[in-house]
């Protein structure tokens, strides 16, 4: 009674955390290493089975300091044997050392219905953890998402497996022993819809064949090559593809079939190596593309797209007005145009240019363009000519936003004044100049 009056809690009262619902306890335990979560089973009868029902398990080799003499693989395998949740939403393994026993020590001990499996290896780059997928394990039949990252070597030639439910596959810096391993992995995913590839690795110069009829989204990105022969060659057959994202200026991409369902694409490639690429982009509604001077030699009537509504152009080197205007005449239904000149390169003594205006105003300017955005506008003669032409001829333009790349306050103020004085073909146009 005295303790209650003084505001001191009775130490014999049940701990409040044990009264929390399981869902909240699961969230709390998911914030600590699995080895620590297992230790909570010693607290009381209430806690004995809480960790066994966790819907998410993250095994981090760097955080497992209290597993005694057990190796990391053995600890993972034994703890998974004790796990009782019928549904395991996510299982993550973060490896630090090389291991070749995942298929024998861990995979067979997963008894829950597993939806997402992630393996990340951060060991020394020279050493790879070899992963094989046994074909007699039910755990792979329920997987919806599979993520592999780091120093991992995949070998599926001798152990074919069927990921019959897999919808999303993420491969980041994963090594393949041969072309067949990559092809068999994809052929084992009959309902795959989302494929994310970042810097595929190989010993030698392989052809990576992507033949997935169900594929809807494909992303391939590549950082600066680590090795001189690290040049991707991808052969793509994906007739159901809707979204395409490629960022690799040295790779070669061959599209075997047309992709009539493609509606969105972001492409950062060297067109001189990928001359067939423009043909597969003719059905897109949203397109993000590099624009550089030499590109004019690789664009022709194959680039005409009546479906394109939104275009973003990343500009490199000096801006060329003629190249932009030649593109616009082939995009009759374009509604929004964004120019991003992040690092403009121009001579201080900008020389007057001769801009060849189209014989007729592009249809998109006369009837459809509503939004115009320019980032990195430096006020060169070429840029002024393009700005004047677009603002004057865009009859339906509602919003124009121009962000300046200026060499000084005085120069910036002059550009603002110049832009605001340009005539506008649309009475609805709201011009915003950012300095």
UniProtKB/Swiss-Prot annotation:
Coiled coil: none annotated. CDD domains: F-box_AtFBL13-like (cd22160). Keywords: Leucine-rich repeat, Repeat. LRR repeats lie at residues 64-95, 146-173, 174-199, 222-248, 266-291, 316-341. SUPFAM superfamilies: F-box domain, RNI-like. Residues 14-62 form the F-box domain. Residues 353-404 form the FBD domain. This is Putative F-box/FBD/LRR-repeat protein At5g56810. It comes from Arabidopsis thaliana (Mouse-ear cress).
């Amino acid at each position: 009674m005295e303790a209650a009056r003084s505001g001191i809690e009775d130490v014999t009262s049940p701990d409040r955390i044990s009264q929390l619902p399981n869902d909240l306890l699961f969230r709390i335990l998911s914030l600590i290493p699995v080895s620590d979560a297992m230790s909570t089973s010693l607290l009381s009868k209430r806690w004995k089975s809480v960790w066994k029902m966790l819907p998410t398990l993250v095994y981090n080799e760097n955080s497992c300091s209290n597993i005694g003499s057990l190796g990391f693989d053995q600890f993972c395998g034994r703890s998974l044997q004790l796990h009782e949740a019928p549904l395991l939403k996510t299982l993550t393994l973060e490896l630090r050392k090389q291991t070749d026993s995942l298929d024998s020590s861990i995979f067979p001990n997963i008894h829950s219905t597993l939806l997402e499996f992630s393996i990340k290896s951060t060991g020394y780059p020279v050493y790879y953890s070899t992963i094989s997928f046994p074909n007699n394990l039910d755990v792979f039949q329920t997987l919806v998402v599979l993520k592999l990252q780091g120093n991992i070597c995949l070998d599926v030639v001798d152990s074919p497996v069927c990921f019959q439910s897999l919808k999303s596959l993420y491969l980041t810096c994963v090594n393949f022993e041969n072309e067949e391993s990559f092809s068999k992995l994809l052929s084992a995913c009959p309902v795959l819809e989302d494929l994310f590839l970042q810097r595929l690795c190989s010993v030698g110069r392989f052809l990576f064949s992507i033949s997935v009829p169900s594929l809807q989204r494909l992303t391939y990105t590549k950082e600066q090559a680590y090795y001189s022969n690290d040049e991707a060659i991808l052969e793509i057959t994906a007739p159901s593809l809707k979204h395409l994202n490629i960022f690799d200026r040295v790779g070669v991409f061959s599209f075997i079939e047309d992709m009539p369902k493609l509606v969105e694409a972001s492409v950062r490639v060297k067109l001189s190596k990928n001359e067939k690429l423009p043909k597969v982009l003719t059905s897109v509604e949203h397109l993000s593309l590099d624009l550089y001077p030499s590109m004019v030699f690789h664009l022709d009537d194959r680039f005409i797209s009546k479906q394109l509504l939104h275009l973003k152009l990343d500009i490199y080197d000096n801006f060329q007005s003629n190249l932009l205007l030649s593109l616009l005449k082939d995009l009759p239904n374009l509604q929004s145009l964004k120019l991003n000149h992040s690092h403009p390169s121009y001579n201080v003594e900008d020389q007057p240019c001769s801009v060849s205006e189209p014989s007729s105003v592009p249809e998109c300017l006369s009837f459809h363009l509503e939004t115009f955005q320019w980032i990195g506008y430096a006020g060169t003669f070429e840029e002024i000519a393009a700005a004047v032409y677009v603002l004057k001829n865009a009859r339906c333009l509602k919003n124009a936003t121009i962000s300046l790349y200026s060499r000084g306050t005085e120069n910036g103020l002059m550009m603002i004044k110049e832009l605001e004085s340009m005539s506008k073909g649309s009475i609805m146009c709201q011009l915003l100049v950012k300095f």
